[in-house]
């Protein structure tokens, strides 16, 4: 027995099995451990049938049901989505700079179509619906019994789906039961394929709780399922046993909770459970689009301090952003490109002598008092961290910033977001007298990259390039890369401030 404290004649003790006296999966040697990026994996699910449930489409379709036919006719096939060059770049099939060699529009190019890529997979919508049911712990997902039989046979061949998963998939429901449930007021949200076939529904979890309605539950289950697949892929790729993960940080945009705690959170633990990480605990980090960079810095600090040997950072999808720009895509008679859900998982561990190091001595942060101008933000995130290391702007091989695919954003008037950021970084380099004004285009081409990420908010912020950077640094083709993200905190109406954070990874010497 371990003595906790003593008062008078009575001694209060805790059993040795109490969590205060156990240090399983925690370091007892707190000597500083240099953190490295041991692995990075991505996951995409092609979900054209879910586009109607994105925030913008769901509102517009409610106001104008006649839009449905036009929207449906502009949804892509799985073959087109898997051949789409930005999707292939996101999954490591091509290097982002290769996009510069291909004329736009990229959606008009008919190239190689592959589900499996070096950094992850693009899953068809049928299988993702099955995954939603596997992630469901409260019988919220009702799938048609015929559809369930078909998808079970397909998922049985997936290398990351287990027998236990198939058991959780269950037998499904008769289609008549699903129709009856959806006919009830607020009873269920339909789950449909691209072709319009209804294969199930999401039911509400509470009759009165507005945070447990079908649309919110669908959003949260999609985030959980996508993040879990990214983490499973990461564990497999790095040959890491699930029980060897002691801590998981989730940095998705979901808000899991109930009416008394609308964002109560800790989806991290649910994701860990779905991946068999029985010795893990975890927590969620929220910072709008800047969340993943904050989470990576925290994970690196936990490893560096010796608290944990390794930490997994996960970020699930943002279903609300499906079809966010669909009206401008319809106006331009182009495919609805926001038809994929994206997730990522990153493993940060102790220095192994090979993996790229994350430099904790050069973290950039946008402080409360820094000001909200773009120049002030870039100064905090780029100039000051470089100054601390005695580096020039050109000493960074690649800058990864907001990597939104311009083919998605430009038709709606949002411009080429990555290009604007790279021009700002180049302008700061001119102010530092490192390059001339005339050299800005060359600097942008050499140290920037075209946007290629799905517009999934936090997912698009810098992290999509991490897998490419790790590959190139380990191959000796790159020395260092900087990752910077910004967050629009003012959208939540609690502050007028923006946010930002950055870090540098470099070759392990």
Specify the residue positions occupied by each region the protein language model found.
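Condensing-enzyme catalytic core mediating Claisen C-C bond formation in acyl metabolism
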Residues: 2-221, 328-393, 446-448, 495-509
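Short acidic, glycine/serine/threonine-rich loops at helix termini
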Residues: 259-262, 294-298, 322-328, 410-413, ...
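Short beta-strand segments
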Residues: 311-317, 481-486
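Glycine-rich beta-alpha junction loops
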Residues: 317-318, 362-368, 400-407, 487-488
């Amino acid at each position: 027995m371990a003595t906790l404290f003593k008062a008078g004649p009575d001694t209060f003790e805790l059993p040795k099995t109490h969590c205060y006296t156990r240090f399983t999966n925690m370091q007892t040697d707190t000597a500083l451990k240099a953190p490295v990026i041991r692995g990075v994996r991505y996951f995409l699910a092609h979900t054209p049938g879910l586009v109607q449930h994105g925030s913008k489409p769901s509102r517009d379709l409610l106001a104008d049901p006649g839009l449905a036919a036009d929207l449906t006719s502009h949804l892509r096939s799985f073959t087109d989505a898997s051949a789409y060059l930005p999707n292939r770049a996101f999954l490591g099939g091509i290097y982002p700079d290769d996009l510069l060699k291909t004329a736009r529009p990229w959606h008009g190019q008919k190239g190689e179509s592959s589900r499996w890529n070096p950094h992850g997979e693009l899953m068809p919508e049928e299988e993702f619906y099955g995954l939603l049911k596997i992630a469901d712990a409260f019988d919220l997902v009702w799938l048609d019994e015929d559809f369930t039989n078909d998808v079970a046979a397909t998922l049985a061949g997936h290398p990351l789906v287990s027998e236990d998963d198939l058991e959780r998939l269950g037998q499904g429901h008769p289609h008549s039961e699903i129709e009856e449930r959806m006919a009830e007021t607020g009873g269920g949200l339909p789950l449909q394929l691209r072709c319009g076939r209804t294969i199930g529904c999401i039911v509400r979890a509470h009759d009165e709780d507005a945070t447990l309605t079908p649309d919110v539950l669908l959003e949260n289950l999609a985030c959980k399922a996508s993040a879990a697949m990214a983490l499973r892929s990461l564990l497999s790729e790095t040959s890491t046993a699930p029980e060897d993960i002691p801590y998981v940080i989730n940095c998705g945009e979901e808000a899991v909770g109930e009416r008394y705690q609308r964002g109560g959170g800790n989806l991290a633990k649910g994701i860990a459970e779905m991946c068999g990480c029985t010795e893990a605990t975890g927590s969620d980090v929220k910072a709008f689009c800047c969340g993943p960079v904050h989470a990576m810095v925290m994970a690196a600090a936990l490893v560096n301090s010796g608290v944990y040997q390794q930490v997994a950072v996960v970020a699930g999808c943002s279903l609300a952003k499906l079809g966010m720009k669909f009206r401008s895509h319809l106006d331009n008679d182009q495919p609805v490109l926001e038809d994929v859900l994206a997730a990522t998982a990153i493993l940060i561990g102790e220095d192994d002598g090979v993996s790229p190091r994350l430099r904790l001595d050069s973290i950039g942060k946008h402080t409360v008092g820094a000001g909200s101008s773009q120049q002030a933000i870039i100064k905090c995130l780029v100039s000051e961290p470089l100054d601390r290391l005695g580096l020039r702007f050109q000493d960074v091989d690649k800058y990864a910033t907001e990597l939104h695919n311009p083919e998605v954003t430009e038709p709606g008037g949002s411009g080429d977001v990555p290009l604007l950021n790279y021009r700002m970084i180049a302008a700061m380099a001119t102010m530092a007298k490192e390059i001339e004004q005339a050299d800005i285009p060359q600097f942008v081409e050499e140290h920037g990259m075209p946007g290629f990420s799905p517009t999934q908010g936090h997912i698009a912020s810098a992290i999509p390039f991490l897998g490419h950077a790790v590959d190139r640094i380990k191959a000796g083709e790159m020395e260092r890369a900087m990752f910077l993200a910004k967050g629009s905190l003012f959208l939540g109406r609690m502050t007028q401030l923006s946010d930002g954070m950055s870090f540098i990874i470099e070759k392990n010497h």
